[in-house]
Amino acid sequence: IHQPDIVICQDPTNRYGDSNIHHPDHRAAGDTALDAIFPSARDYHMFPELVQDEGLLPHKVLEVYLSTRESNASVWIDITDTIDIKVSALKQHASQVGTDAESLERLETRLKQRASDVGTPHAIKYAEAFKYIRLR
């Protein structure tokens, strides 16, 4: 069982952008991740059977990075060295992005432009924006 110190997830309060409404599944995933981090994972009383029957002890996540709009961000991560890996991974999501060359090219252009737009104000070629939470 992996007990992460750092969790990266969607910001469930990030409901829409200037030209889109964010997918409800992404918001729900962010809410679920945050609920699992606190109080579920760190509270013995939430699932006592996991301690008693499985020997799984409570765990405290130390840091959370919420993927968010730039206006809500407190941290910008330089992804310049890994942007091509990100693009390649997202191109594999064929049911969502298509498989024809034109669609994949538009996806790559859009992803790189968005990362550039996020990074440029911070002197970063390509970046992602996060709301950082340090848990006590």
Language-model segments: residues:
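Metal-dependent de-N-acetylase/amidase catalytic core
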Residues: 1-136
